[in-house]
Amino acid sequence: MILLEVNNRIIEEILTLKFENAAAGNKPEVVEVTFADFDGVLYHVSNPNGDKAKVMISISLKFYKELQEHGADEVLKNVYGNFLVAPESGYNVSLLYDLEALPSNKDSVIHQAGMLKRNCFASVFEKYFKFQEEGKEGEKRAVIHYREDETMYVEAKKDRVTVVFSTVFKDDDDVVIGKVFMQEFKEGRRASHTAPQVLFSHREPPLELKDTDAAVGDNIGYITFVLFPRHTSANARDNTINLIHTFRDYLHYHIKCSKAYIHTRMRAKTSDFLKVLNRARPDAEKKEMKTITGKTFAAR
């Protein structure tokens, strides 16, 4: 299985190139790039007001207001400090870098810029991990509509944090492959006693979402993670956040890869069958041709 990158490589490559050119004393060049990421996220890298010595990185998340309710602004301020500026029009968060005043810790700054989406997501997890750490129970469940028709729920108890993702399968084939994929997760947990508990329910939401407006349907699935203190501790939480916030994308990515692999195997097998059939086909019977006088035609 392939782990998706948590960071955004495009941002890191652009910023690395800009910093290297600035450090070498090269004349700055114009940058104007707009690109998308998972979950409907949109990035924009540009020179604000046409100033080539400045690089602005902006991100648009349709669900950012919901993240703000859980302290996203404070988390980003702690991570980015003075690089965080008023957001560009049409975007939720903007970072500004001055190529004439390069930071001493360039590698770290570049890496954190590439983690912008992840750090936006981190606020809701950090909040509920802290609730669990402090033994708080009964706090209102977090509900994040991270996609148009898909939702994430986070709830804290004294001994665990429960994270539930709802997801929509577009095809019947996706449901089948998704079930097999999730069964492998359950089997894999038996080999690792430190792994979180993973549950999958099809059509109906899990008991944790009882009496909510959680969607129900043949193409709806729910993935539940039960995170214990060993997963939410100060030493482990960063890695937990890295892995869990990309899980929905990870699942659907592997469903698509599985379908592509199956189709490739089917095409290869069909090609093999055609070769066998062609070899087994009998040669056409040669019909003897004669003239009216009884002479036989001979092929030249």
Curated annotation (Swiss-Prot):
- Coiled-coil annotated residue ranges, if any: none
Q: What InterPro entries is this protein classified in?
A: ARPC2, ARPC2/4
Q: Which Pfam families match?
A: P34-Arc
GO annotation (BP), single:
actin filament polymerization
Q: What does the UniProt keyword field contain?
A: Actin-binding, Cell projection, Cytoplasm, Cytoskeleton, Nucleus
Q: Which GO terms describe its molecular function?
A: actin filament binding; structural constituent of cytoskeleton
Query: Which Gene3D superfamilies does the record associate with it?
Result: 3.30.1460.20
Q: Name one GO cellular component term.
A: Arp2/3 protein complex
Q: Does the keyword Cytoplasm apply?
A: yes
Primary role: Actin-binding component of the Arp2/3 complex, a multiprotein complex that mediates actin polymerization upon stimulation by nucleation-promoting factor (NPF). The Arp2/3 complex mediates the formation of branched actin networks in the cytoplasm, providing the force for cell motility. In addition to its role in the cytoplasmic cytoskeleton, the Arp2/3 complex also promotes actin polymerization in the nucleus, thereby regulating gene transcription and repair of damaged DNA.
Protein name from the UniProt record: Actin-related protein 2/3 complex subunit 2-B
Q: Which organism is it from?
A: Xenopus laevis
- List the gene name: arpc2-b
